[in-house]
């Protein structure tokens, strides 16, 4: 098998290899294999690397087009995780040196503390059908995940990086921007994938900021933000009534605005105010 792989990778391009279906993209896993090495290298180069971590986890490596460039980096140690058993066996033959750093499993169920003793970074051409779940797992483990560079549907990437006041700004924008600096790096056309997705994709970078905990009740913050955007056309006086009775609200200016008009700092201040009103 090893000699066969050496022959294949020395003779054929990525596009030809994928067409030969060594690893078949599976619709139920949301797989769209990147075929452009130039873009793959650009994604890996977007991982800044800092003295805060020396380990990187790639999610959904497929046939290893990103992994090839990751393994050339000497500033960190690379781990791979793929839920697809076919990809796992392919990668196990391609990168025998990885050993137990190649994981056949579900990223969403992965216990980070069991694998990484210290902080680390995440990178990947992420399955589009679980994009939001991946981002919320990163949020839940923000004490561990220092940096993330990832490919998402363009619409999801825009929502992550959207500023307040824009139509893309929403729940995901606020939660991520509360703890991370978000950068929209570049757009990727459908033709660079096999099979090509129906929409454009985009690469974003998350860099954790200095905020460890918000200066408010974080559980209430999440409730207020969700309530605000679940009825984004209404003023917060109406939307936040899902969290607290209207008769407890005062004439604070935030109650007369819509959720999309508030920055993260505004939502923190609103949460503090709501908390005081609820306790009164």
What residues fall within each predicted segment?
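Catalytic cores of RNA-modifying enzymes
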Residues: 4-227, 265-272, 280
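C-terminal lobe and adjacent flexible extensions of AdoMet/dcAdoMet transferase-like proteins
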Residues: 208, 227-280
């Amino acid at each position: 098998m090893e000699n066969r792989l050496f022959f294949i990778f020395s003779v054929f391009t990525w596009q030809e290899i994928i067409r030969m279906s060594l690893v078949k993209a599976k619709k139920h896993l949301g797989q769209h294999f990147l075929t452009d090495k130039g873009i793959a290298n650009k994604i890996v180069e977007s991982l800044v690397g800092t003295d805060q971590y020396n380990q990187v986890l790639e999610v959904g490596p497929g046939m290893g087009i990103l992994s090839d460039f990751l393994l050339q980096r000497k500033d960190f140690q690379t781990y791979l995780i793929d839920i697809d058993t076919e990809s796992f066996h392919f990668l196990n033959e391609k990168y025998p040196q990885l050993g137990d750093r190649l994981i056949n499993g579900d990223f969403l169920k992965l216990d980070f503390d069991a694998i990484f003793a210290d902080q680390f970074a995440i990178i990947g051409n992420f399955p589009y059908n679980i994009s939001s779940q991946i981002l919320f797992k990163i949020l839940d483990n923000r004490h561990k995940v220092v940096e993330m560079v990832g490919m998402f549907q363009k619409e999801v990437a825009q929502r992550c990086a959207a500023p307040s006041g824009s139509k893309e700004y929403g729940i995901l924008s606020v939660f991520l921007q509360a703890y991370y600096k978000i950068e929209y790096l570049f757009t990727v056309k459908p033709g660079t994938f096999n099979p090509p997705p129906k929409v454009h994709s985009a690469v974003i970078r998350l860099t954790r900021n200095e905020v460890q905990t918000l200066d408010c009740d974080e559980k209430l913050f999440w409730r207020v933000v969700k309530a605000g955007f679940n009825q984004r056309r209404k003023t917060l006086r109406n939307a936040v009534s899902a969290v607290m009775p209207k008769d407890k609200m005062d004439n604070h200016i935030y109650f007369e605005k819509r959720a999309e008009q508030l920055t993260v700092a505004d939502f923190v201040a609103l949460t503090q105010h709501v908390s005081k009103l609820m306790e009164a």
